């Protein structure tokens, strides 16, 4: 049961990192790179971790909230919201949080016996993060 618990916790931590990467890609990728529309979270009324970080930092939180609400119906509001998120420290803070989840995921495996599977699982979070962000992010938005 300890092994199952460790793997379940690994999955939880890696899943959190995976979701944050997805949240970032919605902001730092392009339709062409992703093969689907980006900046969709804001248009769908989904307020992701990077958006909430930017809201907390914004000099005009009421204006920022108005953009959050307006993004559902206005491409201009969605674009301005994205620009304000990208101008904040949200990308850097989200990358830091992803790194924390990746470390937690790998730590969950530390008591498992050494094996190629364990090694692969320990490398997976960081390899996924670096690979997908390099492959799918717009170089114009890479600030890391």
Positions of predicted regions on the chain:
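All-alpha prenyltransferase/terpene-synthase fold signal
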Residues: 1-144
């Amino acid at each position: 049961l300890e092994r199952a618990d460790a793997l379940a916790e690994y999955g939880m931590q890696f899943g959190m990192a995976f979701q944050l990467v997805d949240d970032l890609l919605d902001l730092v990728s392009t339709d062409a790179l992703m093969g689907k529309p980006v900046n969709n979270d804001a248009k769908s009324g989904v307020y992701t971790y990077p958006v909430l970080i930017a809201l907390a930092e914004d000099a005009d939180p009421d204006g920022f909230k108005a953009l959050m609400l307006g993004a559902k119906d206005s491409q201009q509001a969605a674009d301005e919201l994205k620009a304000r998120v990208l101008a904040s420290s949200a990308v850097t803070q989200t990358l830091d949080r992803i790194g924390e989840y990746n470390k937690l995921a790998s730590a969950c495996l530390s008591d498992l016996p050494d094996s190629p599977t364990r090694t692969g699982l320990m490398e997976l979070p960081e390899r996924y993060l670096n690979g997908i962000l390099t492959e799918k992010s717009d170089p114009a938005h890479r600030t890391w």
